Amino acid sequence: MSAVCVDGCATGINPRTLTTELPHLKRGGVHAGLVTTAALETTEVAVGAINQWWRAARLHPDQVRVVTRVPELRAAAAEGVFAAVIHFQGSVPLGTDLELVDAFHRLGLRVMQLTYNYAGPVGDGCLEERDAGLTRFGRQVVERMQQI
């Protein structure tokens, strides 16, 4: 397989809609997606959402696989299995705990949008008039993300 189509924000698919959504994605040529597991949710809710994807992958290994590396994504696509890339649309689940960057990474998180519309511990979102950018904590989060 030479080309892989990845939905950069697959908000329409979740573990509960797998059986109905996957046929549409396959017909559309989508092999993988950044599956949103959190945006403004608490740490606990985000962990639960990630766990639902791992559970779905365990229950339906012929349909979905949680991937954490590019070779895994390519292999899943070549096998006709949807590759789910764990994604946050905001860093709210981190709270102000830098160690949670590592914890979520261990759970499979590979893409995290830093802010989602409003100001938070990491920085200002796009709807904030002051446009203050990243906070000190936000810069630490970015640095840690680059290290892992």
Name these PLM-found stretches.
Residues M1-R136, Q140:
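N-terminal hydrophobic targeting/anchoring segments and the immediately downstream early-domain regions
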Residues V141-I148:
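Substrate-binding cleft of carbohydrate-active enzyme catalytic domains
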